[in-house]
Amino acid sequence: MTWQFVVAGFGVGVLVGMTGMGGGSLMTPILILVFGFDAKVAVGTDILHGAVFKSFGAMRHRMLGTVHARLALWMLLGSVPLSLVGVQIASSLGDGTDGTMTRIVGSALILGGVGFLVKTFLTGHADDAPFLLKPRDRVVAVAIGAIGGFVVGLTSVGSGTFFGLAMLLVYPLTARKIVGTDLLHAAALLWVAGASHLLHGNVDLHAIAWLLIGSIPGVLLGSQMSIKVPERALRVAFGVVLVLSGIKIVGVPQASLIVVIGLAVGALALVVYTARQLLSREVATSPK
């Protein structure tokens, strides 16, 4: 089943490279439902795999100038220590609180995604001018990191989706810069959690090796596409992935089917929209 790992890795890699999110929400269910992994091993394998391939995506976005590195670092100051606190509390409380927190996070993603889509169509896009962090912005970044890190540690979800949602609501960043910053922060946070899972024996290194063969080129391709795709189309994709991630996390009936159909329709619409935009540009710039 090695080629299936490669295909799954590539598809998730492209999505994460373009939107910065959806990796864990998709890969963990794939490992459990398609490949028959034990849930604990699926989570550990997904986290360490995400740390590796998201690092490649973050480096590519950094080269493309679509990363606000200082914002990511300030969020890490809060997220790394609080994620460890969340893991410790989750271990002591059991599964009841985990399920409640997971539903809260999923519901927030659905509402945030819908709100973001509405805002995208009712208003213009964010300015691409440099955004300088003020003291207040740094405090907010640490707070976002602390809250998000705690939730990730407690529920094992939202390393990309939660922080992407928080940044789009708080900071005047373009969609592609949110994607790049989100990837850098998520990669660093996942390395911490992934190392812990590796030490506890919750990682299938054979599966990770084959997943990376697909996910690394996938995330590099997706990162490149994020600067080629028109801003509004990328923002729509961003919002759709937020909503679908929330549906999957909440556990809506037939969630997996809804997510697969939604991603397929969204991908087709994105390809058609982008092709039309590129064609119209060529027509506009061609000599009369």
What are these regions (language model features)?
Residues 1-12, 33, 63-148, 205-288:
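Juxtamembrane transmembrane-helix boundary motif
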Residues 9-20, 146-156:
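Transmembrane alpha-helix interface/packing and boundary motifs in multi-pass membrane proteins
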Residues 13-14, 30, 34, 58-59, ...:
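Alpha-helical transmembrane segments of multipass membrane proteins
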Residues 18-72:
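Juxtamembrane transmembrane-helix termini in multi-pass membrane transport proteins
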Residues 27-41, 162-177:
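Interfacial segments of multi-pass membrane proteins
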Residues 43-51, 76, 80, 182-187, ...:
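Transmembrane helix-bundle signature of multi-pass membrane transporters/permeases
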Residues 53-65, 117, 188-204:
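Membrane-interface helix-cap regions at the ends of transmembrane helices
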